[in-house]
Amino acid sequence: MNEAEAKKITEQYLIEMQEADDTGNFDLYTQRFEHQYIKDFTVERFNSDTKAMHERNGMSQGYEFLAVLRTPDFKGNVIFRTVWKGMYEKRDAIIEFAIYQKNQQWHVIMSAVY
């Protein structure tokens, strides 16, 4: 995979997850994670996290690509991390998004808003 492919895939997943945040859709938010990495992440925690994020940031108004970062292997998987400028009603933020491929399927390993 090259940087352009990493950007394309993470942008698609970012769009899905922002929609999930804005609509409170837990299944949409978690669909790209392997269960082993989110087994303790509950609907209640998702709702609490998104409520706190909306109070701090407001609703999402868009994003802008900043960079692809190099990352070493994690448990035998090469991780592709992308960094985005998230634009929200109340402030701008940094969004870090990481994906890896396993059995021909791309998965999210991390998504964070700073």
Language model segments and positions:
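A generic structural signal for ordered alpha-helices
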Residues: 7-8, 24-31, 75, 89, ...
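Short charge-dense sequence patches
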Residues: 1-4, 45-49, 95
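Exposed beta-sheet edge and beta->alpha loop/turn motif
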Residues: 66-114
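Short solvent-exposed beta->alpha transition segments
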Residues: 11-12, 27-77
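Short, low-complexity N-terminal intrinsically disordered segments enriched in polar/charged residues
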Residues: 1-23
